[in-house]
């Protein structure tokens, strides 16, 4: 599943400069709302009503839970192994006379008894069963022998089970089949089998679609809903004749539905053995464009008819074939299925989902309009497609046995997405962006004492909430970062060889992460050119089983090199023990006297002449930032690097110019170097035209904005930024012929946006005049938006910030009428840039109205308002006042609460705010925080660190900016 909560490069830059906090650090998904019970009931009553009390899903209640009973344990027992399912589903796309959208289903599951048992335990969630002989299921054997009689069936809500108690025992080795008939709500909760809605003109259209990961296949039909319980699935859908149906496999047969001639019944080919969370089926009025890849795979891009007609699926179609072919070569394994459908959904919780053969996306992650979408939108599409297609092998063909190893699925896909996208767009240098997008973003979280290791013991991850909490930036971005490091020190060829062996060995089955280490080690053992200092497992277990990362410190006078667990707050208490005592085995590529060399640090401290320098030479560690660690030097070497940057910055690689800025600011935050040294590392930016160093600087200085935009420090800080960015602004003004053209490369286009955003936010008059004029021209002629798509987020946000009610209302009207999701996203984010508190308060009230803001976008919109210094107190008051209501009514199991907590607390830097946060925790302890629990602890830790940092650095920072802003 792709990272859910996405902010474009442009919007991310705006966030840095206008106080909009960077909220991409944690994987964030949107608020899941309570089911609507009475909407549109007057329009139609064609769907059946839900059954009465005889088949209600009333849970079995007992005074105390007996944990010894298998149905009270969250993990399935090993007694039964599923072989196959036959599932028939009929979604009703109009509400019944209760006002509910529902679906009806029939399911037959075939399973083998692995251990003798007198109880069948299978997952079921929010399903109403039709009783058959006073029971919810019918059981039989395949060999004709009598099956045990059913004593009773019950639904256990806590563990989400349908439990079948038998009067006798199932026989080990014998196969059985169990039938059930059920109904469920086709709710708009973005989980399981759900509905998505969109407008076509004035007509509301409804889509029936799915999102099974992690534990919601059970909400669609009764199933053994764990990733290791692989089986074959035979899916049949019944739907109106004017619609189309899709599933993981190609249709096998379509025919009129005998009971209703207005409907079609389509049976799909049986799937290979696969996990329940990868199932998908969709009924809609969508259209598609298609092609056949070089390897004979049928490719389809599906979306709303208007989006397809306007060519918004063309780019996705053009890159899908090459990316599929790239991964087939990269894995040395053919694509496992006959077709690859990808579909853009109006309402979708995550960024995308890798359902095998039918990948589902948010519209913004799949559709691209060449006239209205930005280069950032285009990059988003190609990287998310690459991420999801990477999963078709790694995750789908071979699947982790349990969610505690989710990092292997998502971390791997988050790494190779850059390789696949780079293959599709070879001129973009996308692989370099991983340093900014993943390595540096996740370090901000992994440097906290409340972080967690990539891999957890399986018995620590049991409940759906615990599973969902794993979908965070550690899993995705740290996973990607350490796999990138592994591939780098092994070499890509060796890495691919081990990977191919792993996939061939475990195809259609399940693994633990140690299986990958074993196959990579085999590849190492078969050659002699690459010989790490220890086995792959010995090296990598220290990166997988320990939280955090080291700071590598070099003394160029003595040649001493050492490592230490890096903590943003050096006073924080690390309560999680490590069997490795927070010592890592770190590969260290370095540059000295213009020559590259390599070193392994596998102890806490060592000494080598390699790290000693003469009076006129410097050393630079972690070339191209392939290692997942920070680097610190003695003061003398820092000064030499600064002198080099200010005399001839081209001698130092672009990525490492960004690294010098990033690492020094983090070291300063941890009080390992003076804050003024880190600030000195930005002086060379007046001569810098490359994107990565500028972006690293702006990301680092964003923390200063959050800490100081309510204090006197902010004035000289803005003046300094204005001084540094002015040459860059006029450089791009000249390069683009006064903003008429765009620079040729991706990185240049991103830095053009940096230049405009920074210049406007720091008060450069020429920039303000530019954005106000562009926005004014659009307001005069709303049907002719001449603002280039790359610049729209920047122009919209700044014009709204500089303007008032008229500018905001115009943007709101354009947002309401936007037909392209990328344009709507730009406007929705820019609407949070207003400086008028009453406007922001009104906008906040709109966020919980799904007629105004889609539910998938609620969290990101609230966070955008909170990240505006004028809107921050409004949102904090709102969250505190409404937490219980939000948590109980809007889905405690969604990812959004972690992001809400993180987004609202980013500015906290005073004792008063810490007290408020502690009181918030105490006041809501009974309600709980669900998947936001860890985020709350991180917020408390970060707030304490912020308080100390501001106290210690405010005067020095104020003095430095004052002295360097003239």
UniProtKB/Swiss-Prot annotation:
Annotated site, Transition state stabilizer, chain positions: 476
One Pfam family matching this protein: Peptidase_M1
Gene source species: Mus musculus
Name recorded for this polypeptide: Aminopeptidase N
Any one of the GO CC terms: extracellular exosome
PANTHER family: AMINOPEPTIDASE N (PTHR11533:SF172), PROTEASE M1 ZINC METALLOPROTEASE (PTHR11533)
Membrane-topology annotation of the record: Single-pass type II membrane protein
Positions of post-translational Phosphotyrosine modification: 852
């Amino acid at each position: 599943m792709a990272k859910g909560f996405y902010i474009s490069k442009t919007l991310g830059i705006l966030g840095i400069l206008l106080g909009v906090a960077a909220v991409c650090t944690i994987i964030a998904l949107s608020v899941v709302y309570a089911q609507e019970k009475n909407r549109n009931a007057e329009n139609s009553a064609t769907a059946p009503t839900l059954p009465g009390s005889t088949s209600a899903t009333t849970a079995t209640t007992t005074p105390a839970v007996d944990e010894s009973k298998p149905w009270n344990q969250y993990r399935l027992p090993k007694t039964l192994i599923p072989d196959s399912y036959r599932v028939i589903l009929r979604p009703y796309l109009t509400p019944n006379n209760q006002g509910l959208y529902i679906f009806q289903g029939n399911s037959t599951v075939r399973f083998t008894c692995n251990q003798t048992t007198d109880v069948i335990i299978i997952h079921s969630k929010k399903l109403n069963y039709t009783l058959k002989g006073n029971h919810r299921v019918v059981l039989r054997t395949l060999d004709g022998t009598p099956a045990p009689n059913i004593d009773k069936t019950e639904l256990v809500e806590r563990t989400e089970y349908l439990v079948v108690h038998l009067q006798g025992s199932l026989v080990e080795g014998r196969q059985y089949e169990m039938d059930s008939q059920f109904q469920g709500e086709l709710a708009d909760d973005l989980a399981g089998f759900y509905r998505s809605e969109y407008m076509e003109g004035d007509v509301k259209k409804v889509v029936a679609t799915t999102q099974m990961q992690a534990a919601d296949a059970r909400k669609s039909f009764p199933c053994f809903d764990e990733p290791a319980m692989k089986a074959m699935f035979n899916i049949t859908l019944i739907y109106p004749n004017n619609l189309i149906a899709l599933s993981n496999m190609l249709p096998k047969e379509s025919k009129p539905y005998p009971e209703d001639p207005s409907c079609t019944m389509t049976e799909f080919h049986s799937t290979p053995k696969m996990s329940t969370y990868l199932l998908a089926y969709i009924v809609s009025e969508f259209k598609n464009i298609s092609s056949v890849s070089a390897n004979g795979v049928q490719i389809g891009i599906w979306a709303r008819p208007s989006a397809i007609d306007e060519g918004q699926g063309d780019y996705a179609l053009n890159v899908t074939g090459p990316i599929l072919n790239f991964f087939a070569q990269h894995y040395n394994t053919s694509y496992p299925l006959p077709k690859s459908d990808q579909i853009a959904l109006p309402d979708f919780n995550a960024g995308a989902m890798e359902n095998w053969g039918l990948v589902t996306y948010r519209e913004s992650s799949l559709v691209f309009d060449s006239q209205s979408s930005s280069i950032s939108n285009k990059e988003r599409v190609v990287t998310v497609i690459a991420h999801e297609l990477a999963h078709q092998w790694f995750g789908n063909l071979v699947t982790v046995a349990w969610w505690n190893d989710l990092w292997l699925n998502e971390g791997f896909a988050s790494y190779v997405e850059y390789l696949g996208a780079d293959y599709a767009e070879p001129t973009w240098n996308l692989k370099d962006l991983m340093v900014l997008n993943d390595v540096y973003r996740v370090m901000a979280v992994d440097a906290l004492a409340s972080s967690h290791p990539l891999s957890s013991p399986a018995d620590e991850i049991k409940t759906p909430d615990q599973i969902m909490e794993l979908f965070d930036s550690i899993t995705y971005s740290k996973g990607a970062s350490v796999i990138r490091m592994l591939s780098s020190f092994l070499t890509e060829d060796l890495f691919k060889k081990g990977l191919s062996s792993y996939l061939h060995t475990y195809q259609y089955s399940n693994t633990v992460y140690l299986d990958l280490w074993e196959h990579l080690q085999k590849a190492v053992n078969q050659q002699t050119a690459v010989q790490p200092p220890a086995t792959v497992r010995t090296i990598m277990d220290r990166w997988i089983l320990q939280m955090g990362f080291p700071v590598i410190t070099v003394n160029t006078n003595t040649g001493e090199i050492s490592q230490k667990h890096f903590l943003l707050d050096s006073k924080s208490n690390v309560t999680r023990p490590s069997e490795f005592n927070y010592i890592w085995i770190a590969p260290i590529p370095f540059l000295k006297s213009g020559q590259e060399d390599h070193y392994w640090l596998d102890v806490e401290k060592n000494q080598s002449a390699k790290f000693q320098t003469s009076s006129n030479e410097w050393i630079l560690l972690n070339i191209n930032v392939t290692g997942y660690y920070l680097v610190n030097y003695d003061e003398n070497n820092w000064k030499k690097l600064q002198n080099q940057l200010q005399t001839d910055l081209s001698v130092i690689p672009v990525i490492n110019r960004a690294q010098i800025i990033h690492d020094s600011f983090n070291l300063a935050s941890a009080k390992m170097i003076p804050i003024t040294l880190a600030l000195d590392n930005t002086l060379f930016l007046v001569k810098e035209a490359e994107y990565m160093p500028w972006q690293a600087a702006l990301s680092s200085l964003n923390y200063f904005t959050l800490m100081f935009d309510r204090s006197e420090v902010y004035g000289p800080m803005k003046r300094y930024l204005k001084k540094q960015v002015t040459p860059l602004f006029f450089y791009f003004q000249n390069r683009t012929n006064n903003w008429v053209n765009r620079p040729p490369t991706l990185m240049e286009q991103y830095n053009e946006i940096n230049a405009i955003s920074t210049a406007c936010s720091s008060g450069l008059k020429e920039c303000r005049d530019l954005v106000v004029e562009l926005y004014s021209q659009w307001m005069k002629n709303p049907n002719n938006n001449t603002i280039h798509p790359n610049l729209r987020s920047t122009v919209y946000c700044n014009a709204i910030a500089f303007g008032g009610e008229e500018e905001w209302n115009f943007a709101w009207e354009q947002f309401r009428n936007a037909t392209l999701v990328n344009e709507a996203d730009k406007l929705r984010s820019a609407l949070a840039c207003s400086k008028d508190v009453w406007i922001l308060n009104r906008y906040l009230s709109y966020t919980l109205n799904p007629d105004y803001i889609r539910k998938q976008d609620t969290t990101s919109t609230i966070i955008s308002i909170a990240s505006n210094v004028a809107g921050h107190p409004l949102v904090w008051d709102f969250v505190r006042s409404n937490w219980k209501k939000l948590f109980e009514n809007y889905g405690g199991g969604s990812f959004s609460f972690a992001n809400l907590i993180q987004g609202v607390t980013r500015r906290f830097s005073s004792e008063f705010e810490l007290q408020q946060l502690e009181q918030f925790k105490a006041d809501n302890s009974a309600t709980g925080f669900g998947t936001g629990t860890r985020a709350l602890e991180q917020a408390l830790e970060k707030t304490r660190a912020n308080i100390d940092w501001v106290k210690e650095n405010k005067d020095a920072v104020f003095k430095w900016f004052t002295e360097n802003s003239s």
